[in-house]
């Protein structure tokens, strides 16, 4: 058969899954074999098989904030899932496991530790997740996207993103010749962000017509009708879609993005070279989205606007103060933060650990 076998452990959110898929592509391009350890009834169960990757699942859910009964059952659940993960590792003769985060990462990593299989972890957020914090004690390599997530030397590799985003022309080239209204992209994730859907149309309505940017607004699943109705009722022109299938073109054409501050979003903004008005999701575990946003803001690549301070009046004030020159400067600063070879760096670290 040739090549080594790697088990990727990632699940729960796209922020864990899509960076892992980029690493899977890099490993397979080098002639290696990849299997995936995920959770049952999960996002990864819907996504991963589409990429031709063998998916194995464990029956495990998160423990933070859940009821006392589930917490009391945790030792039993952990024992059962670790045993099942050991069976999967033996069955596929896994030579290295790579943990990206999510509920499944800890039992999979513990199983690898007990079997003497090397562990590599990659942390996508500025604040390390619970599973990765535990596994870092046993990992042969600790890799991370933000400088302060861990302190392990040589571990800063950035977040893996799609090559077609990293390969976009530099901001100065994209912005050349642009005139007229700013073009602003609004994305709140695949489910949308109700606060953005509500506030952005109201903010634009407060601006004079000739000062309003051109808007391309992703509503999120099931919210297109209500979003378009809000824009129409306020007399504001906007192009609204439920879900953007071609994010590369959306990034290419935008002058600025209004968005949340998930790890994958930050990685794509820096890879593309785009400034942003960042409204972190306030209920994220350990408030990691605020820490992610500060990474861009400290580089003068955008503004952090806490959701508690997000009003139509405040957003209108910010939008009214923007011009293309400022957006270009933010975009150029964002691009300096990019680490475009992240997927290959993670893959090569894992290959070295499996040797």
Curated annotation (Swiss-Prot):
GO terms for biological process: carbohydrate metabolic process; cell division; cell wall organization; lipid glycosylation; peptidoglycan biosynthetic process; regulation of cell shape. SUPFAM superfamilies: UDP-Glycosyltransferase/glycogen phosphorylase. GO terms for molecular function: UDP-N-acetyl-D-glucosamine:N-acetylmuramoyl-L-alanyl-D-glutamyl-meso-2,6-diaminopimelyl-D-alanyl-D-alanine-diphosphoundecaprenol 4-beta-N-acetylglucosaminlytransferase activity; undecaprenyldiphospho-muramoylpentapeptide beta-N-acetylglucosaminyltransferase activity. One of its GO terms (cellular component) is plasma membrane. It catalyses: di-trans,octa-cis-undecaprenyl diphospho-N-acetyl-alpha-D-muramoyl-L-alanyl-D-glutamyl-meso-2,6-diaminopimeloyl-D-alanyl-D-alanine + UDP-N-acetyl-alpha-D-glucosamine = di-trans,octa-cis-undecaprenyl diphospho-[N-acetyl-alpha-D-glucosaminyl-(1->4)]-N-acetyl-alpha-D-muramoyl-L-alanyl-D-glutamyl-meso-2,6-diaminopimeloyl-D-alanyl-D-alanine + UDP + H(+). Its main location: membrane. Pathway: Cell wall biogenesis; peptidoglycan biosynthesis. Keywords: Cell cycle, Cell division, Cell inner membrane, Cell membrane, Cell shape, Cell wall biogenesis/degradation, Glycosyltransferase, Membrane, Peptidoglycan synthesis, Transferase. It is a peripheral membrane protein. It comes from the Bacteria. CDD domains: GT28_MurG (cd03785). It is found in: Cell inner membrane. NCBIfam families: murG (TIGR01133). Belongs to the glycosyltransferase 28 family. MurG subfamily. Cell wall formation. Catalyzes the transfer of a GlcNAc subunit on undecaprenyl-pyrophosphoryl-MurNAc-pentapeptide (lipid intermediate I) to form undecaprenyl-pyrophosphoryl-MurNAc-(pentapeptide)GlcNAc (lipid intermediate II). This is UDP-N-acetylglucosamine--N-acetylmuramyl-(pentapeptide) pyrophosphoryl-undecaprenol N-acetylglucosamine transferase. It comes from Neisseria meningitidis serogroup C / serotype 2a (strain ATCC 700532 / DSM 15464 / FAM18). The lineage of its organism: Bacteria, Pseudomonadati, Pseudomonadota, Betaproteobacteria, Neisseriales.
